[in-house]
Amino acid sequence: TKVLFAALLLSATTAFAQQEKLGSGIDKANMDLTIKPGNDFYRYAAGNWMKNNPLDAEHTDNGAFTDLFEQNQKRIQDIILEYASKPQQKGSLEQKIGSLYNLRMDSVRLNKEGWAPIKPTLDRIAAIKDRREYQLVTAQLDFRGEGTMMFGIGVDADLRDAANNIVQVGQGGIGLGVRDYYVNDDAQTKKIREAYKAYMKKLFQMVGNDEATAQKKMEAVMAIETRIAKASYSQVQLRDIDKNYHKMTYNQLVIDYPGIDWGNVFLASGFPAFKEICVGQPEPIHEVEKVLAETSLDDLKTYAEIKVIAGATSVLSDDFRAVAFELSKVMSGVQQDRPRWKRAVGTVSGVLGEAIGKIYVEKYFPESSKKRMLDLVHNLQTALAQRIDEA
């Protein structure tokens, strides 16, 4: 038996040796071997690739995922152009896709309209008479995607019961997105903060305010956002599930946070009746209560105004887009804006994403690819389950 086993082992080894040897998945030409891996492993592993594939003026990164993204942008444009290049049945999904794309590409019309498309919304904000109406109107506008509320609301998986969804409230309301931009004092952060102030002031001027008024409005918004930011959680704190999970009944929410008109907020936001809610970060929500109570109504309306204006910069005339891109250059380092067709594709994908996705899958994602991905996910789940069981 031992002799037979040895013979089989030798035979298998010989057969294996006769097979074509697989090459290494590591291409040393991409490495920078002059760098010590202990000092900068990333440059050690990919330094020469980075030298040979420099960033262009339009992108903040480079690599396979960037290439795939750009490939998909072109594919989506091809899909859209099928409907945008010829008349479609009125009211059909195809007509909506084509018309939206053509509108975004019509620079003559957009530049002629200027900020007229958002004037009715700004007029509605200006007409607000009291704080209760302010909360109602800003909730209605936020539901439309204007971003006018000082916190975020939505529905997501319960972090302690992933099989069920739950209504969630969390920090938000700051234009720069991250707390650090408001509280840190390093040179780069200060530069970003000043660029943001200049950006807001310019936008206020572009919708009819003189320089002094625009300056005053900018300062009012900055004061509100800084208050909220200082109370908000840092990026590190946001990683702690326990500190970001405060489940309660709706009735308890109303008791614990009385400074927010929750009934009108949820009604205006399209929520049906619900029993439970999770508050992610209590401190910034309490700070919003104080801001709503202590800030003048005019300054509150100014805050809502800038959210509407800033949110529309990508779909208004070219001068609004240019101002927004100047801020983007400071924050991201990108030196060249995306061409108009890419921005138009982005708008259509954002507004009619599910429809575009369905068409994309039918054209570019065959059943065989779906099976491969399902198998991959299944294998990943199995491997992770095994690791959890063995831990």
Regions found by a protein language model. Give the residues of each.
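Bacterial Sec-dependent N-terminal signal peptides
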Residues: T1-E20
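Short, intrinsically disordered, charge-balanced linker/junction segments flanking boundaries
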Residues: T13-F16, E133, L384-E390
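Short, Gly/Pro- and small/polar-rich lid/capping loops
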Residues: Q19-A29
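A charge-rich, low-complexity, intrinsically flexible signal that marks solvent-exposed coils, linkers
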Residues: A29, L33-P37
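Active-site-surrounding "flap" and adjacent substrate/cofactor-binding loops of secreted or lumenal enzymes
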Residues: K36-N39, Y44-R109
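Noncatalytic, helix-rich "gating/capping" subdomain that lines the substrate-entry/channel surface
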Residues: Y83-L374, N379
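Zn2+-dependent metallopeptidase catalytic core
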Residues: M373-A391
